[in-house]
From Swiss-Prot:
Its main location: cytoplasm. GO terms for cellular component: cytosol. This is Ribosome-binding factor A. One of its GO terms (biological process) is maturation of SSU-rRNA. Monomer. Binds 30S ribosomal subunits, but not 50S ribosomal subunits or 70S ribosomes. It comes from Desulfotalea psychrophila (strain LSv54 / DSM 12343). GO terms for molecular function: ribosomal small subunit binding. Belongs to the RbfA family. Keywords: Cytoplasm, Ribosome biogenesis. The keyword Electron transport does not apply.
Amino acid sequence: MSVWDPKEILDSIGLGKRTEVKRSTRVADAIRKELAVLLLEKIRDPKLQDVGISRVTATDDLTIVKIYYTIYGPHKHVKAVDKAFLAATGFIRSHLARTLNMRYTPNLQFCYDKTAEKVAEIENIFQEIAKERQDNGENS
């Protein structure tokens, strides 16, 4: 009769050992959280009202951070939001320097995240295919 060992069971399904997360991933996650707080509480620019941070990536040497954002609501004013982020970059970097306690604050690059639009396109294609199949099934 074998003794039940939870560590052995977790190891067998790949959950026993912690996987090490890269520092750049941890820093990117911290920056994403700080930016979310900044957008909600401190940045007063009306162009950034309907903006959310979808993901943040950082280079391994932490010199460049790419911040991907989405725009909620009916107005997709990407150029205006880009200009607003460009104007607020200094404020955002200084805030990140104070809160993250890093020796060097990375350069910030803001990029519009087109993932939501691509998902909507694919969903529309699937709906069209389903409608065509339904129409072909009725005509047969």
